[in-house]
Amino acid sequence: MFYKGIKVLSLFFIDEVDHYRKYDESGNPVNGIFADMFEQEYEDVLQNLQLKIGEDDYLKYLQSISAEKTHAGYFSIDKKGRMINSKIKRSETSSDDVDAYDLIMKNKELLLDRNPQKSPVRFIFSHSALREGWDNPNVFQICTLKQSSS
């Protein structure tokens, strides 16, 4: 898709926000287990990527984006500016994740921009289903991550 000018996005739905983003004692954001795993796996894949002849531009593109910058979380935000779990009522199938929804909708053009300095994000983590209307055609992978207890 890269050579057709399409930026591919991947969407991860996760069970708990703190699996993606936590906060230290001073309130500074730090990676949760899923963000750490993602960055480790991303680096491993990038180092072991075997491309075909003529795919040098794609490799340069990937190498121009750090693992830390190629993913982002879109979650509800509390009054302190911290990411929090969305509340889903039993009778609803969507969440009150208004901040996440607005952020994705308002920055849709930027999100699709292939310039890695302007828009490095290609992997999006969210706590709950996005409301109708987020019809981004560039999302080709959607998965659910949930920490198991076994």
Kindly give the residue locations of the regions a language model identified.
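Catalytic or ion-translocation cores adjacent to nucleophile or general acid/base/metal-coordination motifs
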Residues: 140-150
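Short glycine-/polar-rich loops that comprise or flank the Walker A/P-loop
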Residues: 8, 136-141
